[in-house]
Amino acid sequence: GGMTAIKALIMRDQDRAAPRGTGDVKVGGNYASSIWSLEAAHKQGFSNVLYLDAATHSKVEEFGAANFFGIKNNTYVTPKSSSILPSITNKSLRQIAADLGLTVEERDIPVEELATFEEAGACGTAAVISPIGALYDLDNNVTYDFGMKVGETCKKMYNHLQGIQYGRVEDVHNWNVVVM
């Protein structure tokens, strides 16, 4: 695939979604609330913004328009929260990770745990996977560096999902529908 690792900013002073709000549904207001943050991040040279939970700002939630996942110890880890949009792409990647022999965990991810991931990514419909090369927490002067080279697990998952989408890999889960 044509993936390139990106740099993203951890946003602590803006929230993507309110607790008990509409973060788990696809509505324009969720995207509108992240426009200022993304513009500010772009001005500082970052490609994306990672939001934390609005209640405590201590747990990873998601990017403005994509879910977060991390890879460590042969495990695919993604946040579980009522304010995160349930992503079909993330659901597909969780299944593919399991198919590839990884353990899959949906759970709270404390910000400090970012330091333990070998790979990280943003996943969604448009890019499937945008590998994260580094996450910058400017408020705490911490950089979580995953390497600007795309990780092997991200590559495998991306190629597998793309292979299913384009008919190069057997669709054992019956995800594809022929439309005539």
Residue ranges with predicted function:
Residues G1-M180:
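Helix-start/capping segments and mature chain N-termini
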